[in-house]
């Protein structure tokens, strides 16, 4: 169970890293670069730990799914990106797929 928690945290850190890259695109600063590096390094470390007991394909799919869905949600909530029913449906589909992979593992 701890490995799955670390996988969820890894996905959240990937999501944060992508949000930080968006922030860096708006304001070039060493601070953002350092935060991006730390965020992604922590994300990869936790992903590596999770892969000790979780199959690689499952771990990677869940990790990227969290990052993809989370990045889209951050865009909608904080950066005024388009939010329509189709977009929300497919974000939900990504999350349901991650849950399905957890159930199968």
From Swiss-Prot:
Record protein name field: Probable guanidinium efflux system subunit GdnD
GO MF annotation list: transmembrane transporter activity
Chief site of localization: membrane
Signal sequence extent: none
KO phenotype (gene knockout): Deletion of both gdnC and gdnD leads to a decrease in the concentration of guanidine required to inhibit bacterial growth.
The keyword Transcription is annotated on this UniProt entry: no
CC per GO annotation: plasma membrane
InterPro entries assigned to the protein according to its UniProt record, in alphabetical order: Small_drug/metabolite_transptr (IPR000390), Small_multidrug_res (IPR045324)
Organism annotation: Bacillus subtilis (strain 168)
Membrane topology according to the record: Multi-pass membrane protein
Record has Transport as a keyword: yes
Any one of the GO BP annotations: transmembrane transport
Localization in the cell: Cell membrane
Inducers of expression: Transcriptionally regulated by guanidine, via a guanidine-sensing riboswitch.
Keywords in alphabetical order: Cell membrane, Ion transport, Membrane, Transmembrane, Transmembrane helix, Transport
Subunit structure of this chain's protein: The efflux pump is composed of GdnC and GdnD.
Function: Probably involved in guanidinium transport. In vitro, confers resistance to a broad range of toxic compounds such as cationic dyes, neutral and anionic antimicrobials.
Family classification: Belongs to the drug/metabolite transporter (DMT) superfamily. Small multidrug resistance (SMR) (TC 2.A.7.1) family. YkkC/YkkD subfamily.
Transmembrane segments: 1-21, 32-52, 59-79, 85-105
Source organism superkingdom: Bacteria
